Amino acid sequence: VAPPPNGSWFRIVDYPPGFPGRRHKTDTIDYAICMSGEINMELDDGIMVHMKAGDVLVQRGTVHSWINKGDETCRIAFILIDAESVGLPHE
C-alpha cells in the first residue's frame, strides 16, 4: 500500500523462516532497517542483497522481493516516502 500523496508510511514487518518472497515494485523512496534476523532482497536482475540486524537499505522504484532463507524470523522496519514513479526499461 502506497503512502498518500506527499506523505509517508512507517511499518514493521516480520518475515518468517522460509518466506519465499513476492516480486513487487514500490513507487516510493524506501528505507528498510533490519532489526533482527537476516534476509535477502532479490532484485529483478538476480542480484541478491543480504541484510542482517543493524543493516539499512535505501531504494527507489526497484522491482524486488524479500526472501528469508534463514531459520529465524527477520523483522524489518520500513519507512516509505511518496515519490514520483521511476520508469524502468521493461515497463
Task: Give residue ranges: language-model regions.
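Short acidic-glycine-tyrosine-enriched beta hairpin
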Residues: 45-62
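Short beta-strand His + acidic residue motifs that chelate non-heme Fe in jelly-roll/DSBH
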Residues: 21-23, 41-42, 64-70
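Compact, glycine-rich, soluble single-domain proteins
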Residues: 1-2
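Conserved short histidine dyad/triad with adjacent acidic residue
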Residues: 8-27, 60-63, 82
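Glycine- and acidic-residue-biased ligand/ion/polar-headgroup-sensing regions
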Residues: 27-45
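Double-stranded beta-helix
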Residues: 67-91
